[in-house]
């Protein structure tokens, strides 16, 4: 559909004729709280790779998470030393601390303590947390005491995104003995995607995107992909330089209630469509134009024996009436009955 907007002519078919996935399905048989397998289809050829690559990059780099950013160990002046009575040197202890996964419900820095006094293994579960912080992998090894000595760790936790080197943290104390840590804040541990062939009606030249997401448990895989999609949407929307509400719809995506399009009350038989298209609509129990326009293109393509040729034919007819697929018509049945009564009264 060509619509004039100011001194420009906007061709809405640039996007309206593309197939769009109606929803994302989750494979419940293999998914859990830390792993999700999602299927998105159908997509235009090549779009699965484009979307999958963008989602993967954002998932791994841009989501907020919590991590230790600094530690102070009793009796330790710097990272390149050893601790009497501890099997690991300080460098190894620091590396182990970086592997501890945390969940935090506040943006304010939190200060935790780990205190031990008996020989044996020290794990992340020994950290004394508070109401704002949770250790997600309590079995993560930190150090091993070979003697009964008292050892204290003072730990600072912050929220952030991506990977932040130790010297890039802002506002940390410069006191002697405070060891700054490289922090991997991302709650997403791994992302993989594959592209397969999808079918729409009789056509098979479409894409299916299969996206797999592994998280540390601080965010669900479902929320992780939702956040990444929101980030991408917000970043690219600035490129749209025209009013998106240009297809005869108001801001709610509904038919304009000021001038109700009476073409909506037409019978399918009045459209002079091909026999094949008409029969397909009737087999789908679509009798009126108002019922037809509320269907999405994807819904129509799933109708038995309904193909791209019939879709294009119907879209052209609807366009001539100032209508299109995917139009929300609030209270259509009520309006149709009122219109029928009015027609009968005038007759």
Swiss-Prot record:
Entry GO CC: cytoplasm; DNA-directed RNA polymerase complex
Record EC number: 2.7.7.6
Keyword Nucleotidyltransferase: yes
Annotated segments matching region Alpha N-terminal domain (alpha-NTD): 1-243
SMART domains: RPOLD
MF terms in GO: DNA binding; DNA-directed RNA polymerase activity; protein dimerization activity
Keyword Ubl conjugation: no
Region annotated Alpha C-terminal domain (alpha-CTD), chain positions: 260-347
CDD domains: RNAP_alpha_NTD (cd06928)
InterPro entries to which the protein is assigned, alphabetical: DNA-dir_RNA_pol_insert, DNA-dir_RNA_pol_RpoA/D/Rpb3, DNA-dir_RpoA, RBP11-like, RNAP_asu_C, RNApol_insert_sf
Listed transmembrane segments: none
GO biological process, one term: DNA-templated transcription
Reactions it catalyzes: RNA(n) + a ribonucleoside 5'-triphosphate = RNA(n+1) + diphosphate
Annotated keywords: DNA-directed RNA polymerase, Nucleotidyltransferase, Transcription, Transferase
NCBIfam families in alphabetical order: PRK05182.1-2, PRK05182.2-5, rpoA
Task performed by this protein: DNA-dependent RNA polymerase catalyzes the transcription of DNA into RNA using the four ribonucleoside triphosphates as substrates.
Assembly mode: Homodimer. The RNAP catalytic core consists of 2 alpha, 1 beta, 1 beta' and 1 omega subunit. When a sigma factor is associated with the core the holoenzyme is formed, which can initiate transcription.
Domain note: The N-terminal domain is essential for RNAP assembly and basal transcription, whereas the C-terminal domain is involved in interaction with transcriptional regulators and with upstream promoter elements.
Family: Belongs to the RNA polymerase alpha chain family.
Name this protein carries in UniProt: DNA-directed RNA polymerase subunit alpha
Species in which this protein is naturally found: Nitratidesulfovibrio vulgaris (strain ATCC 29579 / DSM 644 / CCUG 34227 / NCIMB 8303 / VKM B-1760 / Hildenborough)
């Amino acid at each position: 559909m060509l619509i004039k907007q100011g001194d420009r002519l906007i061709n809405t078919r640039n996007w309206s004729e593309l197939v769009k996935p109606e929803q994302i399905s989750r494979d419940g048989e293999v998914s859990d709280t830390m792993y999700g397998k999602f299927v998105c289809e159908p997509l235009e050829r090549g779009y699965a790779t484009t979307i999958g690559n963008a989602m993967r990059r954002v998932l791994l780099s841009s989501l907020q998470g919590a991590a230790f950013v600094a530690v102070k160990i009793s009796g330790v002046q710097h990272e390149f030393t050893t601790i009497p009575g501890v099997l690991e040197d300080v460098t190894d202890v620091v590396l182990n601390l970086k592997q501890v996964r945390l969940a935090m419900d506040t943006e304010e820095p939190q200060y935790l303590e780990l205190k031990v006094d008996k020989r044996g293994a020290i794990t992340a579960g020994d950290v004394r947390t508070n109401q704002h912080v949770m250790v997600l992998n309590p079995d993560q090894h930190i150090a091993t005491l070979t003697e009964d000595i008292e050892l204290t760790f003072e730990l600072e936790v912050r929220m952030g995104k991506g990977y932040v080197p130790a010297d890039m943290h802002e506002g940390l104390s410069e006191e002697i003995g405070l060891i700054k840590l490289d922090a991997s804040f991302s709650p997403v541990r791994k992302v993989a995607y594959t592209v397969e062939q999808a079918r729409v009606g009789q056509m098979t030249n479409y894409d299916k995107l299969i996206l797999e997401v592994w998280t540390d448990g601080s965010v669900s895989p479902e929320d992780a992909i939702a956040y990444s999609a929101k980030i991408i949407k917000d970043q690219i929307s600035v490129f749209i330089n025209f009013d998106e509400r240009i297809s005869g719809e108001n801001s709610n995506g509904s038919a304009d209630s000021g001038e109700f399009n009476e073409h909506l009350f037409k019978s399918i038989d009045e459209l002079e469509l091909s026999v094949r298209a008409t029969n397909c609509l009737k087999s789908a129990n679509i009798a009126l134009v108002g019922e037809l326009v509320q269907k999405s293109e994807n819904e129509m393509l799933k109708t038995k024996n309904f193909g791209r040729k019939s879709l294009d034919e119907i879209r052209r007819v609807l366009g001539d009436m100032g209508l299109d697929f995917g139009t929300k018509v609030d209270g259509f049945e009520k309006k149709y009955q009122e219109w029928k009564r009015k027609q009968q009264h005038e007759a």
